[in-house]
């Protein structure tokens, strides 16, 4: 270990000399208290260090000790249901060690619990040949997560010894005989956060990650292994969209990174998730969740680390063969941390003061999402879906963070302040948002939900776009200038907006909608349009069509529970009989 000396302190940036043996991205201990920092720049024997803790009280002349290791996370049983800070220190253990409700300086705690024993069940046996990624056994971590213990990267050989029983994360569970001698394996492995975990090959995402949110699943789906951005101004509902996707998203593991946002939002997650039941397993949502909290009052430098810590944990579960989603709320705060460090390093600023490498750093993060075949004999398939919130100042999506993000991701859920002020939630603007996975996801929906899913979706989207065009005419010359056919289109588009796209996150039946229910709801609304068109052709007045009692039942169909979904078929039958009755009574042609 090499010791240097501090010559400059500037907020979270510390410059030390005598560091000629250190490397970029080495972890260092700064000052007498041993604050954790990371070298981000070397100039001769001078190292620029970003410190992940509060630097008040540190001054020139204090020692800096290099560890010679990159910033790494501990991966093993104990991750699920835990809450970490940006550099993977468990907040509950931290609070006990520091005896304080706030982050104290220089407190060292292990990421994974060293006392807790986990029941290890071997699946490999003595004499088996193993290499990186092969599963040698399992630990039932929670009721829903079976933690597969994998051979670490770089280890290849024959199992010499393997034990069953209860072990902590540091005890030896197996010995592998390699060309370089015997290698002891434990339940835990370490991995540097800035380096993506290796895999056998990448796959094309073909399956949608269903979220139970109608506007997302029907109109702007994201694939398992895809990347999505949620930009929007303050108060438009970014965090609620992220929470909804984290709660109801069709993934087996959720990693939620609160990066520079309010502490109360992480408290909401901690309060709500344990009480909510996963619709697939019936267990608490917390039993599949890892939380990383790096709130706005925590050290700025740790925001950058928190994003990498989160994606590394997500990749670890992906390698086990799980589908994982990672929520980053918000990447703008992370970019602001980059901007602050860049300014203190006196680098040449780019757009709006952000560093020139903002785009490549964002790409480093989002490109670690994807669907892959993991290393190992059994060819496990896993996926990481990355969903990042972006908070552009004033909702201006032409600013650098949003633009750099949109160049990388394939799904854009644009939140609209005007919709939010009208109390339309989720406030995703259907005219500006897009999904480049639409065609592939449409094929999957046609094959697995209903063969006319794509046709219904296209028809509904065309109606919404036509409504926007007709609204211009209505503003100029009024509703009376429109033909009955156009007025019907406006009424159906209004029904799509209010009865389908609008969704109440706090209503037990409306907060989550299965794909089957989504199809039946959209089919009901568009069937009303088709039947009404037949009635208009037969000479029935539009006012009579719009006053049909069945319209109220269609509007309230969103509140039908998943168990009583067959009631929608009854509404469809009622709709057809009421329309046929109107047509038989006749209208303008019989007058």
Curated annotation (Swiss-Prot):
The keyword RNA-binding does not apply. Keywords: ATP synthesis, ATP-binding, Hydrogen ion transport, Ion transport, Nucleotide-binding, Translocase, Transport. It is an enzyme of class 7 (translocase). GO terms for cellular component: proton-transporting ATP synthase complex. Its EC number is 7.1.2.2. It catalyses: ATP + H2O + 4 H(+)(in) = ADP + phosphate + 5 H(+)(out). GO terms for biological process: proton motive force-driven plasma membrane ATP synthesis. One of its GO terms (molecular function) is proton-transporting ATPase activity, rotational mechanism. InterPro entries: ATP-synt_VA_C, ATP-synth_a_Xtn, ATP_synth_asu-like_sf, ATPase_a/bsu_AS, ATPase_F1/V1/A1_a/bsu_N, ATPase_F1/V1/A1_a/bsu_N_sf, ATPase_F1/V1/A1_a/bsu_nucl-bd, ATPase_F1/V1_b/a_C. ATP binds at residues 232-239. The keyword Ion transport applies. Produces ATP from ADP in the presence of a proton gradient across the membrane. The V-type alpha chain is a catalytic subunit. Belongs to the ATPase alpha/beta chains family. This is V-type ATP synthase alpha chain. It comes from Clostridium perfringens (strain 13 / Type A).
């Amino acid at each position: 270990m090499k010791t240097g000396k501090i010559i400059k302190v500037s907020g979270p940036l510390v410059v030390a000399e005598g560091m000629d043996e250190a490397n970029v991205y080495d972890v260092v201990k700064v000052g007498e208290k041993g604050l954790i920092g990371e070298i981000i720049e070397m100039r001769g024997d001078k190292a620029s260090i970003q410190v992940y803790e509060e630097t008040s009280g540190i001054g020139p002349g204090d020692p800096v000790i290099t560890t010679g290791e990159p910033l790494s996370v501990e991966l093993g049983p104990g991750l699920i249901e835990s809450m970490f800070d940006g550099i993977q220190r468990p907040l509950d253990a931290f609070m006990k060690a520091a005896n304080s409700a706030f982050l104290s300086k220089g407190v060292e705690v292990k990421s994974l619990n060293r006392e807790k024993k986990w029941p290890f069940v071997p699946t490999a046996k003595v004499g088996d040949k193993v290499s990186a990624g092969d599963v040698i056994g399992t630990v039932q971590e929670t009721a829903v997560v079976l933690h597969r213990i994998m051979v670490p990267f770089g280890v290849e050989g024959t199992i010499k010894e393997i034990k069953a029983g209860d072990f902590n994360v540091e005890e030896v569970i197996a010995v592998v005989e390699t060309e370089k001698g015997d290698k002891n394996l434990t339940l835990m492995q370490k991995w540097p956060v800035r380096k993506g975990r290796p895999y056998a090959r990448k796959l094309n995402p073909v399956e949608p990650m269903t979220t139970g949110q109608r506007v997302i699943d029907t109109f702007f789906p994201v694939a398992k292994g895809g990347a999505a951005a949620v930009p929007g101004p303050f108060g438009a509902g970014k965090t609620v969209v992220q929470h909804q996707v984290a709660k109801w998203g069709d993934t087996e593991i959720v990693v939620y990174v609160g990066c520079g946002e309010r502490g109360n939002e992480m408290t909401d997650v901690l309060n709500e998730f344990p009480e909510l039941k996963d619709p697939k397993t019936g267990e608490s949502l917390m039993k599949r969740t890892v939380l990383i909290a790096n709130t706005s009052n925590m050290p700025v430098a740790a925001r950058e680390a928190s994003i990498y810590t989160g994606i590394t944990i997500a990749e670890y579960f992906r390698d086990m063969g799980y589908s994982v989603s990672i929520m980053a709320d918000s990447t703008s705060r992370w970019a602001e941390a980059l901007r602050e460090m860049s300014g203190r390093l006196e680098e040449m600023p780019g757009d709006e003061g952000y560093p020139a490498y903002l785009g490549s750093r964002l790409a480093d993060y989002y490109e670690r999402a994807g669907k892959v075949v993991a290393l190992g004999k059994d060819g496990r398939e896993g996926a990481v879906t990355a969903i990042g919130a972006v908070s552009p100042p004033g909702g201006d999506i032409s600013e650098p963070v949003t633009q750099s993000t949109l160049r990388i991701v394939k799904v854009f859920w644009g939140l609209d302040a005007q919709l939010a002020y009208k109390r339309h939630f989720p406030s995703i603007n259907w005219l500006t948002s897009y999904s480049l996975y639409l065609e592939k996801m449409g094929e999957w929906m046609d094959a697995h939900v209903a063969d006319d899913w794509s046709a219904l979706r296209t028809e509904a989207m065309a109606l919404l776009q036509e409504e926007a065009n007709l609204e211009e005419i209505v503003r100029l010359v009024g509703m009376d200038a429109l033909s009955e056919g156009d007025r019907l289109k406006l009424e159906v588009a209004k029904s799509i907006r209010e009865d389908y796209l609008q969704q109440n996150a706090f209503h037990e039946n409306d907060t989550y909608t299965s794909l089957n229910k989504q199809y039946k709801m959209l089919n009901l609304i568009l069937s009303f349009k088709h039947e009404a068109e037949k009635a208009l052709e037969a000479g029935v007045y539009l006012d009579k069509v719009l006053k049909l009692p069945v319209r109220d039942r269609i509007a309230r169909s969103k509140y039908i529970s998943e168990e009583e979904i067959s009631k929608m078929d009854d509404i469809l039958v009622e709709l057809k009989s009421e329309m046929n009755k109107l047509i038989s009574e006749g209208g303008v042609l019989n007058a």
